[in-house]
Amino acid sequence: MYFELKENKPHGTKDDPFSTYHIKNEGRSFQIPVHWHDELEIIYVKSGFLTVSISGENYIGTPGDAFVVSPGNLHFMGSQTDTVDYFTFLFPLKYISFCINDMLDDKLLEPLKNGHLMISPRVKDTAKELCEQLVEIYMAKNKKTEPQITAQIKTKIILLQFILPHFKNKL
């Protein structure tokens, strides 16, 4: 059953494996079906209320809340209220790897990828600020006001900043 729930939709491209999805739902309730994927996902609630379920734990996201879905974790999201505006950021962990089998890979990225380590789903503190920066990069990419390589460099720096506090706290 678990393998049947794998999301097979490709995320990103070879040149830019980081994906941003902006979901603005108005006027009706909805639910994204339960699924899992190999990428790490950050869910950021911009406005409204979002029900998020990660590995059987249920949360109610309010404006400014962020959630992390580790690779392989079953999750779904939805809303019973009329309006919610949220973003999801998906990326393979190798996107922020320096591809040299260093301590970052050995102690954090590989264990996350293999399911031996998980980031706590509910994220606090600086998450809102970092997610807002990711939203700004997404908007600039859509408007083509920033070179693609610049957007990728900024995105990777922000993602590393996002993960750093969790690594400091031994996840």
Can you describe what each PLM-predicted range is?
Residues M1-I60, D106, L117:
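Generic protein-terminus/edge-of-domain signal
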Residues Y2-S19, F76-A140:
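A hydrophobic/aromatic-rich effector-binding and dimerization subdomain
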Residues D15-P17, E39, P63, T83-D85, ...:
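A structure-centric signal for secondary-structure junctions around beta-strands
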Residues L40, F87, L160:
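Residue-level detector of short, conserved catalytic/binding motifs and their immediate flanks
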Residues T51, F67, P71-M77, Y95-I96:
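Histidine-centered metal-chelating micro-motifs
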Residues G56-P71:
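Short acidic-glycine-tyrosine-enriched beta hairpin
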Residues R122-L171:
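An amphipathic alpha-helical interaction segment
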